[in-house]
C-alpha cells in the first residue's frame, strides 16, 4: 500500500514556525499510534526554484503545484506569510478547492486563511482567521462566512482546519486529530507538554506510548 502524502505549500517569506510542530511529528511519526499509517511530507511551490523562508532558510521544493496528486494526498497544509496578500496564488487555491471537493483535508494558518476567504472557501465551514474584520475587508464579496467565524486559536470543521498565526500548537493538534495519527491520550499529553512545559506531561506522553 502506497504511503499517503501530506503536501506543504511553500512561498518566499512563508512563516517557518507556523507548520513546524505539525510537519515534524507527521514526518517523524515518533508519537503515532500503532494503527496509524506512516505519511510522507512533500513540499510544493509554484516552481522548483529555492524558496527562502521568513527565517532565512533556503528550501528546495519537492515538486510544483501542478504535480500534486490528489489520489495520493492525505492533506494539504498552507502555512502563512505576507505573500498571501500580495502575490497571486490561484493555482494552489484551486488545488485547495479540489481537495475539499474530494473530501481531502486542507489546513490553513494565518494569512493563508485570508487567501481561502478571498476565494469563497470559508463560506460553508466553521473557521477562524487573523481577525474577522480584516477577513471581511480583504475577502470582500467572495467572503460570506462571517456567521461561521469562531474566535478560537484553531477550528476544525469536517475537512477544513483554520488557525490564527499565533496558534501553531493548536493548528498541529487539529491536524493530528483529523489524520487520526495520535491516540487521544498522546494528543492531550503532547499538547499540554508543549503548552505548559511541565515534566508531568512528558511522563504522560511516554506513558501514552507504552
Identify what each model region corresponds to.
Residues 54:
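A short, charged, and often flexible helix/loop element on the N-terminal side
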Residues 4-15, 21, 28-47, 57, ...:
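Active-site-adjacent pocket-lining segments in enzyme domains
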Amino acid at each position: 500500500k502506497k504511503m499517503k502524502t501530506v503536501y506543504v505549500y511553500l512561498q518566499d517569506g512563508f512563516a517557518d514556525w507556523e507548520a513546524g510542530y505539525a510537519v515534524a511529528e507527521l514526518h517523524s511519526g515518533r508519537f503515532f499510534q500503532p494503527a496509524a499509517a506512516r505519511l510522507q511530507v512533500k513540499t510544493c511551490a509554484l516552481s522548483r526554484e529555492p524558496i527562502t523562508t521568513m527565517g532565512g532558510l533556503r528550501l528546495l521544493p519537492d515538486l510544483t503545484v501542478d504535480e500534486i496528486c490528489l489520489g495520493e494526498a492525505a492533506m494539504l497544509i498552507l502555512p502563512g506569510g505576507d505573500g498571501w496578500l500580495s502575490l497571486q496564488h490561484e493555482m494552489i487555491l484551486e488545488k485547495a478547492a479540489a481537495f475539499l471537493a474530494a473530501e481531502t483535508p486542507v489546513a490553513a494558518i494565518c494569512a493563508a486563511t485570508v487567501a481561502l476567504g478571498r476565494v469563497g472557501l470559508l463560506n460553508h465551514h466553521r473557521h477562524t482567521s487573523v481577525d474577522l474584520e480584516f477577513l471581511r475587508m480583504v475577502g470582500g464579496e467572495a467572503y460570506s462566512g462571517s456567521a461561521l467565524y469562531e474566535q478560537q486559536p484553531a477550528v476544525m470543521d469536517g475537512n477544513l482546519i483554520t488557525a490564527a498565526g499565533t496558534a501553531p500548537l493548536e493548528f498541529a493538534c487539529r491536524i493530528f486529530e483529523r489524520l487520526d495519527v495520535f491516540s487521544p491520550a498522546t494528543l492531550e499529553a503532547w499538547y499540554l507538554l508543549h503548552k505548559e512545559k511541565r515534566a508531568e506531561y512528558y511522563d504522560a506522553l511516554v506513558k501514552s506510548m507504552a
